[in-house]
Amino acid sequence: MKKNTSLFIVAAICCFSCSRPEPQTEDILLSDGWLIQAESKVDQEWYKASVPCTVMGALTSENGLYNDLFVGKNYADIDKEQFEEPWFYKTTFETPALKEGQRVELAFDGISYRADIWLNGQQIASSEEHFGPFRQFSYDVTDVIAERNELTVKVYRWQKGEFNIGFVDWNPRPADESMGIFRPVWLRYSNEVSIKDPAVRSRLDTVDFDEAWLMVEATLSNASDKEVSGKLCGKFENGSFAYPVTLAAGETRTVKVTPDQARKLHVKNPRLWWCHNLGNPEMYSMDISFVADGKVSDSHKVDFGIRQIGDWFNEEGYRGFILNGKKVLIKGAGWTDDIFLRNSDERNALEVAYVKDMNMNTIRFEEVWGTSQNIYDECDRQGVLALVGWSCHWEWEVYTGKPNDRYGCISTEEDIELISQSWRDQILWLRNHPSIICWYGASDMLPRPALEQRYLDILAEIDDRPYTVHAGSAKSPLSGPAGMKMWGPYEWQAPYYWYSEEAKGKAVGFNTETGIGAQFPIYESLVKFIPEDQLWPVGEAYDYHTTTSRDALHDLNELKMVIEKRFGGATDLNDFIRKAHLTDYEGTRAMIEAHRVNVPRSTGIIQWMLNSAWPSLYWQMYDWYLVPTAGYWSVKKGCSPQQLIYNYGDNHLYAVNDEKEDVSMRARMKAYGLDGKLLCDASADADMPMGSSTKLFEVLPKGEEIDDVMFLFLTLEDRKGKVVSRNEYVIAEDMDRHDWSKYRWWRTQVDEYADFSALNTLAQADIAASMTIKDDILEVTLENRSSVVAFFVDLKLKDAAGEMIVPAFWSDNFVSLAPGETRVLTCRASSLPSGASVTVAGWNVSTEILKF
């Protein structure tokens, strides 16, 4: 929240007004000009830093150290002893002289893990009290501040048994254990009365959407030794209000203003906040101030959305979510911050844009991630839902360094006090974000009942959105069933797995984390972190960049097995990569699509994961270099608002509709053999109610007329014949088969693999490719001039040096073209520089470079 220094507010109630108050001093963000150094080296040259940053974040990003840290296994050799001792952060800054009656607080939004703090040589906080990364602290420094100031912060890293930022098994532990000032530092100004934690809540008429009711809430603190009378004022586009408040000397009180007290809080024809696939994410801003004696004592700008979120349970007991009266199928993925918490605002904006581009609508934050509120601001702006809660990091001894029982590691009264206060701080910090639709009390395990009761008491006091006890399927004695599930898998499973009633991870209910394991980056990314002499064969350097899980998932053996059994192995690195990409493409798409087919039995799916904290080969829709994986493009296709989907379980086509309007369309299917022979040409009308899945017709009976493999081409057309969406599949004569008795938490064993080895003999296709640029949009036309399918054609936009241009938002990628088919693909890119080119290549298509 930021100060607003000139409010001109006309009272909507009462006989007095807030007009033309004297402005106040703006808050100051202390971000630039910091220096850091280890305690034992304070007499040496200090490193420059910008806050927020961890120690490793500053050493790498701002001082150029450890440039090859992520190459091969180099990270294993980093000297971690240098972070065993405390590090100092220091900065100098100037401030305007305080006005009469003015007060100033020094606020820290997040430090890991402990800190001693001095301002102008006077200690204002001790590490015995200032600890816990998710606590937020504010200190009155009115009597210490000067016009020129020096701030020194001594930070101590996490120690075993403490509750730190929650990286788990998707990357190695941060070398510095995230030690540092990882969230903003502020100077906050006010007069006698300060405003804390202002919030705007909304209720909505979810039938006609023509009116909403707002409640404004703020905690007011009178720091003076006398009674203060004034007005809590608000101004937004619907009008203004002024609510009289009198505070006794030293009093702190939470004030709530409702439409009964301020009629302007009853909003007619509101602009609603929707997730992007249902509408526009409309936002409002409200200036909230406390005015006394004609002066603004304190003020904040609050951004908020008018929306109403709720939940429901289907017949099988699984939870789903309702936004503005509409049931929403959650389609999302799990977030992680960078390993050294170096996420820039620009990177956050792009990553959320990727979620939107994939036609997903949700991010799960298994941790209250973010070095500021920016990532949640982006979710608000771009219409992406957010599920926010604690990480399983605190539930297992291997990560926390403290024994766990069935409630995890948070066990003592001191632990419960720290975590419950952290819960309060984080919810107060984030509760104005309309994108956040649920708080998670835990991840893998239930929280201890005494801790959960604290959570529930806090929520009853400060927030009203849905809460679930954890991300699994357990039932709490206090809050009831979680209504979700976390049974995996986390490793590759055959596409039909998701449709099988026997599968633990079948596409029923709300699966809060699941994925197919290895999601291989493209060659251009791979060579940045795998040493050249270790690129082939795939070995230890690759395995080091999988996961740190102890039981499984720590090597590429499963992917190698799939490629060997389904494709007959790989002849070289490029062959391995394309087969890894196809494995990712069809496996990830099937996981998402099965949940769309199975609504309303399915209520949500979270792909594990969205992104990576470092260069990785596992669990990612795009890599650490922000280049999409093959799964990105299959999810983009599978999540198209209206789509045709092939059900691997019953061999039928389904029409699905995720938008908020009913539609009627025409479904078409063509099937081709390996030799390009047309096996089937069928069509049907598809009536597609909002939020529905409609069974259409059977594909060729399994095995009938299929010679090794069959290619399916599906199109959905509107009543004017315009293609709304496309989907392409390659199907083997016989499906993979699982042994359902051999279940482990990461996968169910596959006993028989589908045979796609015939793809190795697919005849060469002749593709004519051309390129034009119209209104800064790149258009590439692909014409298949051959009599066979042009399979798995990939387009890459590169600069003159051969580097991938990021971002490059293609309309589609990894496409297949039927014999004689022509497709036009478009691309919106961050830039189209001179010398750039598009590389076109495919499974059976020769590489062609289209130069600008």
What are these regions (language model features)?
Residues 30, 50, 69, 77, ...:
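An acidic-aromatic loop/edge-strand motif
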Residues 218-219, 223-225, 539-813, 817-827, ...:
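Carbohydrate-binding surfaces of carbohydrate-active enzymes
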Residues 22-107, 165-181, 313-314, 545-580, ...:
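Extended carbohydrate-recognition surfaces in non-catalytic/accessory domains of CAZymes
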Residues 362-551, 579, 583, 587, ...:
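Substrate-binding/catalytic cleft of secreted carbohydrate-active enzymes
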Residues 124-126, 146, 150-189, 267-288, ...:
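Glycine/proline-rich low-complexity spacer/linker segments in large multi-domain proteins
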Residues 65-94, 99-108, 113-119, 125-128, ...:
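Active-site-adjacent substrate/metal-binding segments within catalytic domains
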Residues 143-148, 217-313:
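Extended acidic/polar, glycine-enriched regions
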